[in-house]
Amino acid sequence: MLKSVAPYIGKYKKYTVIASVLTTLGIIANVAPYFFLYQLILPLTRHQLPDFHFVVVRVLLIFACLAFYAISYTTGLCFSHVSAYNTLKNIRISLKSKLENQPLGNIKEMGTGQIKRVFTDDIDQIELLLAHAIPEGIANLLVPLIVIIAMFIVDWRLALLTLAIIPVGVFAMSMMMKAGMSKMGAYYESAKKMNNTIIEYVNGMEAIKVFNKDGDSFRRFGDAVRGYRDFTLAWYKVCWPWMAVYNSTLPCLAFFTLPIGALLVLNGTIDLSQLLLVLCMSFSIGSSILRALSFGGKIPQLDYKIAELEKMMNGDAIKQGTHGFEGKNYDIEFKDVKFSYKKSAVVEPVETTNEEKSAVVSTSSTTVYSEVLHGINLTLKQGTTTALIGESGSGKSTLAKLLVHFYDLDSGSIKIGGQDITDMSIEALNNQISYVAQEQFLFNTSLYENILIGRPTATREEVLDAAHRAQCDEFLARFPKGIDTMAGDSGKQLSGGERQRISLARAILKNAPVIVLDEATAFMDPENEEKMNAAIAEIVKDKTVIVIAHRLSSIKNADKICVLKAGNVIAEGTHEELMKNCEEFQKLWAASTQAAEWRI
């Protein structure tokens, strides 16, 4: 487990070492007062009054040790937390990079809830290992070990009596861990379902209210939360008895020592001073042993969380090379492209006990593949505009997403200027393509910074010019802060059409040689669509353009139109050629024309 986390500690490893040393010194200082207490009690057992100076010195030493313990232990934890949170930062940055290099399908399959849980909750749990389990665990095991050796030096019989209760506590802890581990996977599946359901419920609030689905949606939400509650309570019901046993036995190391030791004193086998010293030692380390072993109870959970983290970290990275763009031009070639979407099919649920009936049951799943593109062959010449049309589900958007390398192909190749896109780094490929999708995400920052994403090195004047060319001036004038207005969560401050114009401004600013417009005018009213088309016409000059549209009137003048049906290209040509020779295009054109003429 620690081996998995160690690469991310980096230069902060020394902080963990310092923390371990300081906490160990702190625990020693916390144990020492019991020895001074023994020195104060010892004269009384011999019917003697200790010297006043002797008492004052011991009392001052006790306070000094407690003060040193507080300072040393707290300082040690400060060092360990600096190390821990910098390590968590490194893990999150690494996870972000790994996710960026994974196919979009893998990320969607995980779900927002699971990704959020791993990024926040699971990684936060590693803080327990780095900030507490390592420095405190070492200190709370090392110091008791030294004290136990000292006990054997005082009297081996009393030492064995002191240790006799520990196996009971360790056995109880092992049973608790065994019971917990048997349900660990199902517990986290229950938590994952609850997280995803909560996020779905919040994100779908608008649709829930519009279609009066409060009851159905809240029922699913409530079932997920209750399932998590019931499973957690059932899990803890199994663990609680064992937890109570080890929590009550481990601190009581004098359980056998006190009665049997007293008999040994009465029999004259040992001296009372020996018993008192061993009792003081046992009182001093009971809490330390409990603290050290308590981390053991949390290790299985950490193991599972780190395994989940590693699974996400080690997901299949998207295929990419290390070269920059080396193409001789910006012709695009799709050659024998086949692609399947990966789906998880749930198989039979695993039987559960009666206690878990209301909770989420454990399931097994298998991966199935649904081929959506079947040997696509297309050539798009530099400086031309190619439109992809077809019914919903025909593969238009999938083809565009494959060009920007959101997914890996099953087979075939996609080349730009003769260079396979898998030969380039993702960064190099992204520099060649501007992708404007139907649904554009805006970050909760200013509109200026959202446009600046297109080219981070651009000047403010260039950003303002891009916004102007994307027809953003009209709605920016409504805001007191203009382009510096905050976009809101997911761009909720703007309408759908306004968000698309901001995304188009990004593309204008980026000025890439290849442009993909995936339903870029889908949310536009006729007036704004005309403005957008004018802006698009300006930026696509001398560029290789792919347009995906349902409104066929908008792509009538495209250099080439490709008709897709059920994952195949069934025809390609100009508008006039397809109107003469392609029955499928004629049907699509008639449907589009009829839709445009529809009135209430």
Give residue spans per PLM region.
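Juxtamembrane helix-loop junctions of ABC transporter transmembrane domains
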Residues: 29-38, 65-112, 116, 120, ...
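Membrane-integrated ABC transporters
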Residues: 1-30, 50-57, 76-80, 84, ...
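Transmembrane helices of ABC transporter permease
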Residues: 11, 15-28, 69, 135-186, ...
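Transmembrane helix-loop-helix hairpins at lipid-water interfaces of multipass membrane proteins
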Residues: 16-72, 153-157, 272
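Cytosolic ends of transmembrane helices, especially the final helix of ABC transmembrane type-1 domains
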Residues: 213, 284-312
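Short intracellular "coupling" helices and adjacent cytoplasmic loop segments at the cytosolic face
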Residues: 85, 93-117, 121-123, 197-220, ...
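ABC-type nucleotide-binding domain
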Residues: 328-600
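An intracellular "coupling" helix at the cytosolic face of ABC transporter transmembrane type-1 domains
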Residues: 10-14, 104-105, 121-130, 134, ...
